[in-house]
Amino acid sequence: MATTKSFLILFFMILATTSSTCAKLEEMVTVLSIDGGGIKGIIPAIILEFLEGQLQEVDNNKDARLADYFDVIGGTSTGGLLTAMITTPNENNRPFAAAKDIVPFYFEHGPHIFNYSGSIIGPMYDGKYLLQVLQEKLGETRVHQALTEVAISSFDIKTNKPVIFTKSNLAKSPELDAKMYDICYSTAAAPIYFPPHYFITHTSNGDIYEFNLVDGGVATVGDPALLSLSVATRLAQEDPAFSSIKSLDYKQMLLLSLGTGTNSEFDKTYTAQEAAKWGPLRWMLAIQQMTNAASSYMTDYYISTVFQARHSQNNYLRVQENALTGTTTEMDDASEANMELLVQVGETLLKKPVSKDSPETYEEALKRFAKLLSNRKKLRANKASY
């Protein structure tokens, strides 16, 4: 319902837009969105590594990083973790992780993060190792220090409201300037899998502000693309760097949305006759799967519609594998064999066509995006020098 409402708001705003001006590349708002999916985050990590490599090649700069090119980077669950890794600064004020470092991170830490607690009550995993490694990697860094705008979602089970961590919200809501490791654990704390996360910050008056958070997928149902777009829209309205965007104009939005894979056989898994025999527990598990699958599809459909309505379909690229099988469909199978399979999925995906109606592969589309991102960065730098 929340996703549908968000789309309708965006859609009618677009219909009300009458601007027909050509897009200025230097003033395009660039957005990267990364889905949730646990260990399946290896798939978008492969895509990010390829894209960052292309940017380094195009700009002849081995130190080029994704955060240098995107105005907004958003993620939920494992996508929130990836967002933090590529936007959190090191001691040199550069991203502490290059895209090529992400897959090794999963291989090193995944088996310890998804190490069954053995408890018959409570979550499947105690989350202690996950929180520990996040503290070690992200340190005391807070939201305001991120190298570009971020949009990381979570859900507060005490207030029963989504919580969105962004730099642009801090002036009005300074209590959202939380430590990145707290945010990353919270957005990954999927019900059933990990315990909820409690931490405190302070308001502008110095009062204690409490958070009781679970997985951001509860708020965005796994795909944060609409959230990332809404943050980008606000950025375009408030930042003088985007002064040519007088109204919501998707000709000046460039969106790359990365999925963690879905199971194409999901629709064939159940029949009405089988489901008629299910009890409440079986329905709970199935509904969670159905909701995630349907939401991912509908979010992509909604966004495709709004970009096409503005004749800007080439400004949106959704990279998603829809044919996961076997263990690769599991968000918590961190065995080395399965992680190797996920790497293969990501590498194979690059060679696949973007759609059945287009001969362009994801690899070719990402190369096109890399050139756009590079040219926009150069034009913006030239404009700033005058």
From Swiss-Prot:
Show the Gene3D superfamilies listed in the entry: Cytosolic phospholipase A2 catalytic domain
Keywords on record: Coiled coil, Glycoprotein, Hydrolase, Lipid degradation, Lipid metabolism, Plant defense, Signal, Storage protein, Vacuole
Cite the InterPro entries for this sequence: Acyl_Trfase/lysoPLipase, PNPLA_dom
> Do the record's keywords include Cell membrane?
no
**Where in the cell is the protein located?**
Vacuole
- Give the coiled coil ranges: 321-384
Q: Where is this motif: GXGXXG?
A: 36-41
**Is Signal one of the keywords?**
yes
Give a GO molecular function annotation for the protein.
Answer: phospholipase activity
Q: Can you tell me which residues form the catalytic site?
A: 77, 215
**Motif GXSXG boundaries:** 75-79
Q: Which Pfam families match?
A: Patatin
Major location, coarse class?
other
Q: Which residues are glycosylated?
A: 115
What Gene Ontology biological process does one annotation of this record name? defense response
Q: What does this protein do?
A: Probable lipolytic acyl hydrolase (LAH), an activity which is thought to be involved in the response of tubers to pathogens.
Q: Which family does it belong to?
A: Belongs to the patatin family.
**Entry note about domains:** The nitrogen atoms of the two glycine residues in the GGXR motif define the oxyanion hole, and stabilize the oxyanion that forms during the nucleophilic attack by the catalytic serine during substrate cleavage.
| Note in the entry | Patatin have a dual role as a somatic storage protein and as an enzyme involved in host resistance.
Q: What is this protein called?
A: Patatin-10
Q: Which organism is it from?
A: Solanum tuberosum
